[in-house]
Amino acid sequence: MQDIRRDKFSGRIMGIDFGSKRIGISISDPTLTIAQGLFVLENNSKVFEEIKEICSQYNVGLIVIGLPVKLSGKHSNKTNEVVKFINELKSKLKIEVISWDERLTTKLAQKSKIEMNLKKKKRQDKNLNDVIASSLILQSYLDYLKNKETMVARNED
Protein backbone atom coordinates (compact mmCIF):
# COMPACT_ATOMS: atom_id res chain seq x y z
CA MET A 1 0.00 0.00 0.00
CA GLN A 2 1.16 3.48 -0.67
CA ASP A 3 0.99 6.67 1.31
CA ILE A 4 0.98 10.25 0.17
CA ARG A 5 1.50 13.42 2.14
CA ARG A 6 -1.44 15.81 2.38
CA ASP A 7 0.66 18.66 1.00
CA LYS A 8 1.30 16.69 -2.22
CA PHE A 9 -2.24 17.15 -3.54
CA SER A 10 -5.19 19.50 -3.25
CA GLY A 11 -8.89 18.87 -3.50
CA ARG A 12 -11.03 15.92 -2.55
CA ILE A 13 -10.17 12.23 -2.57
CA MET A 14 -12.02 9.66 -4.68
CA GLY A 15 -12.37 6.07 -3.51
CA ILE A 16 -12.65 3.22 -5.99
CA ASP A 17 -13.69 -0.39 -5.45
CA PHE A 18 -12.54 -2.07 -8.66
CA GLY A 19 -14.42 -4.96 -10.19
CA SER A 20 -14.17 -6.59 -13.60
CA LYS A 21 -17.84 -5.70 -14.27
CA ARG A 22 -18.60 -2.78 -11.93
CA ILE A 23 -16.56 -0.06 -10.23
CA GLY A 24 -17.83 1.49 -7.00
CA ILE A 25 -17.16 5.22 -6.65
CA SER A 26 -17.08 7.32 -3.48
CA ILE A 27 -15.88 10.84 -2.70
CA SER A 28 -14.59 12.61 0.38
CA ASP A 29 -16.09 15.77 1.76
CA PRO A 30 -13.96 18.92 1.20
CA THR A 31 -12.41 18.61 4.69
CA LEU A 32 -11.26 15.03 3.97
CA THR A 33 -13.18 13.72 6.98
CA ILE A 34 -16.11 11.70 5.65
CA ALA A 35 -16.44 9.34 2.68
CA GLN A 36 -19.71 9.36 0.78
CA GLY A 37 -20.73 6.68 -1.69
CA LEU A 38 -21.76 8.04 -5.06
CA PHE A 39 -22.61 5.35 -7.60
CA VAL A 40 -21.34 2.47 -9.69
CA LEU A 41 -19.77 2.72 -13.12
CA GLU A 42 -19.85 -0.11 -15.62
CA ASN A 43 -16.31 -1.30 -16.28
CA ASN A 44 -16.23 -0.74 -20.03
CA SER A 45 -14.33 1.28 -22.63
CA LYS A 46 -15.80 4.57 -21.31
CA VAL A 47 -14.80 4.09 -17.67
CA PHE A 48 -11.59 6.16 -17.78
CA GLU A 49 -13.37 9.10 -19.40
CA GLU A 50 -16.18 8.84 -16.84
CA ILE A 51 -13.69 8.82 -13.95
CA LYS A 52 -11.94 11.83 -15.47
CA GLU A 53 -15.26 13.72 -15.62
CA ILE A 54 -16.07 12.86 -12.00
CA CYS A 55 -12.61 14.04 -10.93
CA SER A 56 -13.22 17.35 -12.66
CA GLN A 57 -16.74 17.74 -11.25
CA TYR A 58 -15.64 17.07 -7.64
CA ASN A 59 -12.17 18.69 -7.79
CA VAL A 60 -10.41 15.41 -7.03
CA GLY A 61 -6.71 15.61 -6.23
CA LEU A 62 -6.09 12.00 -5.24
CA ILE A 63 -7.63 8.63 -6.10
CA VAL A 64 -7.47 5.73 -3.63
CA ILE A 65 -8.14 2.30 -5.14
CA GLY A 66 -8.73 -0.78 -3.04
CA LEU A 67 -6.04 -3.40 -3.53
CA PRO A 68 -7.27 -6.94 -2.91
CA VAL A 69 -4.88 -8.86 -0.69
CA LYS A 70 -5.43 -12.05 1.26
CA LEU A 71 -5.69 -12.01 5.05
CA SER A 72 -2.10 -13.30 5.10
CA GLY A 73 -1.03 -10.13 3.27
CA LYS A 74 -0.22 -11.99 0.05
CA HIS A 75 -1.61 -10.84 -3.27
CA SER A 76 -4.78 -12.44 -4.54
CA ASN A 77 -5.57 -13.48 -8.12
CA LYS A 78 -7.38 -10.18 -8.66
CA THR A 79 -4.41 -8.06 -7.52
CA ASN A 80 -2.71 -8.04 -10.94
CA GLU A 81 -5.95 -6.92 -12.59
CA VAL A 82 -6.23 -4.01 -10.15
CA VAL A 83 -2.57 -3.03 -10.58
CA LYS A 84 -3.07 -2.98 -14.37
CA PHE A 85 -6.13 -0.74 -13.92
CA ILE A 86 -4.16 1.58 -11.60
CA ASN A 87 -1.33 1.90 -14.13
CA GLU A 88 -3.76 2.62 -16.95
CA LEU A 89 -5.59 5.19 -14.82
CA LYS A 90 -2.29 6.91 -13.96
CA SER A 91 -1.38 7.11 -17.64
CA LYS A 92 -4.75 8.65 -18.62
CA LEU A 93 -5.22 11.13 -15.75
CA LYS A 94 -2.96 13.77 -14.32
CA ILE A 95 -4.04 12.88 -10.78
CA GLU A 96 -2.12 10.96 -8.13
CA VAL A 97 -3.43 7.39 -7.79
CA ILE A 98 -2.56 5.10 -4.87
CA SER A 99 -3.61 1.63 -3.76
CA TRP A 100 -5.03 0.90 -0.31
CA ASP A 101 -5.63 -2.38 1.51
CA GLU A 102 -9.23 -3.44 0.94
CA ARG A 103 -9.23 -6.58 3.07
CA LEU A 104 -12.71 -7.46 4.33
CA THR A 105 -14.45 -4.43 2.77
CA THR A 106 -16.88 -6.60 0.80
CA LYS A 107 -17.84 -8.53 3.94
CA LEU A 108 -18.17 -5.27 5.90
CA ALA A 109 -20.33 -3.82 3.12
CA GLN A 110 -22.63 -6.84 3.29
CA LYS A 111 -22.78 -6.62 7.09
CA SER A 112 -23.57 -2.89 7.00
CA LYS A 113 -26.51 -3.55 4.66
CA ILE A 114 -27.94 -5.97 7.22
CA GLU A 115 -27.39 -3.44 10.02
CA MET A 116 -29.26 -0.82 7.98
CA ASN A 117 -32.30 -3.11 8.10
CA LEU A 118 -32.59 -3.16 4.32
CA LYS A 119 -35.06 -5.56 2.78
CA LYS A 120 -33.55 -8.73 1.33
CA LYS A 121 -33.99 -7.57 -2.28
CA LYS A 122 -32.10 -4.33 -1.58
CA ARG A 123 -29.37 -6.21 0.34
CA GLN A 124 -28.79 -8.36 -2.76
CA ASP A 125 -28.12 -5.26 -4.89
CA LYS A 126 -24.51 -5.71 -6.03
CA ASN A 127 -24.26 -2.06 -7.04
CA LEU A 128 -25.01 -0.99 -3.48
CA ASN A 129 -22.35 -3.40 -2.25
CA ASP A 130 -19.75 -1.82 -4.57
CA VAL A 131 -20.65 1.72 -3.49
CA ILE A 132 -20.46 0.81 0.20
CA ALA A 133 -17.15 -1.01 -0.34
CA SER A 134 -15.66 2.04 -2.09
CA SER A 135 -16.82 4.21 0.83
CA LEU A 136 -15.22 1.85 3.34
CA ILE A 137 -11.92 1.88 1.43
CA LEU A 138 -11.94 5.66 1.26
CA GLN A 139 -13.02 6.12 4.89
CA SER A 140 -10.18 3.84 5.98
CA TYR A 141 -7.71 6.07 4.13
CA LEU A 142 -9.27 9.29 5.49
CA ASP A 143 -9.06 7.90 9.04
CA TYR A 144 -5.43 7.00 8.42
CA LEU A 145 -4.69 10.56 7.25
CA LYS A 146 -6.41 12.03 10.31
CA ASN A 147 -4.53 9.71 12.69
CA LYS A 148 -1.25 10.49 10.96
CA GLU A 149 -1.85 14.24 11.31
CA THR A 150 -2.69 13.78 15.01
CA MET A 151 0.54 11.84 15.61
CA VAL A 152 2.62 14.49 13.83
CA ALA A 153 0.95 17.25 15.88
CA ARG A 154 1.67 15.37 19.14
CA ASN A 155 5.31 14.89 18.18
CA GLU A 156 5.67 18.61 17.47
CA ASP A 157 4.46 19.54 20.98
Feature annotation, model-predicted:
Residues 1-14, 20-21, 26-157:
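Phosphate- and other anionic-substrate recognition elements at nucleic-acid/protein interfaces
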